[in-house]
């Protein structure tokens, strides 16, 4: 993900990897309906997205002369490279190697456990005031220096999940979970993200959606409900014709009857 060899040892393949306009706007100019104001998620934005003028002492061998994105060296063409997981060279941190930052690959973060609890507590409702859910939700926000909330809406949860886990490959699964009960809502959301948009003006170092942008964006197909599920493989349908959907795309289901052939709780681990 590193955008130059000044911030990674020898190899830097992230020069053309940028934060999308939609995510950048959500980090820096989010309309928080619960708080009733526009908010800038400064801490997580700073550590997730490198934008012009952001100072990173941790990327320099001399913290008094920090690496400043776009100043120490030119910013990329989109001016918003991915900062998360970019931790500098071995001279800076003492352990990075070419093609190996030394960062652990997290299988499950505590913040994910907390937000999954909030999701479960909310269920199919659009908000929750469950005390434990609020405790966990606000614990995640406190770490990011964001104000606490006394009610969590689904939009709050979606936003928090996206901010906390940006570039970690988890956000899509949060949307899929929502689509189980609010399919069209998710499809509409996916089709209103200003995809493939240019938004950095290098001459002024400003960030705004290009005047020439038209939705849904260049080389972007509109999402449909079919994009939210993986089809059952042809090989599996051939082996079991009952898995073949009908003309409406539905698969016949029957209730499973538990009987003597199942192992009971007492013998499960014998």
Residue ranges and their predicted role:
Residues 35-270:
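Acidic/polar-rich alpha-helix caps and helix-coil junctions
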Residues 1-30, 194, 203:
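Polar, glycine-rich mid-to-C-terminal structural blocks
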């Amino acid at each position: 993900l590193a955008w130059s060899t000044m911030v990674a040892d020898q190899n830097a393949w992230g020069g053309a990897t940028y934060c999308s306009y939609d995510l950048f706007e959500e980090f820096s100019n989010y309309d928080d309906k619960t708080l009733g104001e526009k908010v800038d998620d400064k801490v997580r934005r700073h550590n997730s997205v490198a934008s012009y003028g952001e100072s990173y002492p941790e990327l320099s061998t001399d913290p008094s002369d920090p690496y400043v994105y776009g100043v120490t060296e030119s910013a990329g063409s989109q001016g918003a490279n991915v900062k998360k997981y970019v931790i500098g060279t071995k001279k800076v941190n003492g352990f990075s190697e070419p093609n190996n930052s030394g960062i652990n690959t997290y299988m499950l973060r505590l913040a994910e456990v907390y937000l999954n609890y909030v999701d479960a507590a909310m269920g199919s409702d659009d908000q929750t005031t469950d005390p434990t859910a609020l405790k966990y939700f606000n614990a995640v926000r406190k770490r990011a220096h964001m104000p606490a909330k006394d009610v969590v809406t689904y939009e709050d949860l979606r936003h928090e999940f996206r901010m906390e886990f940006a570039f970690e490959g988890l956000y899509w699964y949060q949307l899929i979970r929502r689509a189980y009960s609010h399919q069209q809502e998710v499809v509409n959301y996916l089709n209103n993200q200003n995809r493939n948009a240019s938004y950095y003006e290098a001459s002024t170092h400003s960030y705004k959606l290009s005047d020439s942008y038209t939705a849904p964006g260049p080389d972007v197909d509109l999402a449909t409900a079919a994009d939210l599920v993986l089809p059952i493989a042809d090989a599996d349908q051939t082996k079991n014709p009952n898995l073949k959907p009908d003309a409406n795309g539905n698969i016949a289901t029957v209730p499973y009857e538990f009987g003597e052939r199942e192992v009971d709780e007492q013998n499960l681990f014998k």
